[in-house]
């Protein structure tokens, strides 16, 4: 029962984030779900500590978002460079991280190449 409750809570917040992403202009549910499922995998890998590490560690938050946006980008059928730039902009502006757009774009490109 504990894991099911964790999953329900995570999915509830995940759907809120998916709705917000669609509101921001994303029109591909599968890509948004790939992003949020990556966060679920991070949660599982961290033995449930993902939310705390995400909140209190900018370095962890950056790595988490790079991995999630790379998964989202890879799930699109086209590899539109404009979309990659948009994701890099969101990473640099929306996550309280001390990274520039250029740094974010370089890091995201490296994540995709790995």
Predicted features, each with a name:
Residues 1, 57, 98-100:
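Helix N-terminus capping/helix-initiation residues
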Residues 10-11, 16-19, 27, 31, ...:
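Post-HEXXH active-site segment of zinc metalloproteases
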Residues 23:
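Short, surface-exposed binding/anchoring microloops in extracellular/periplasmic proteins
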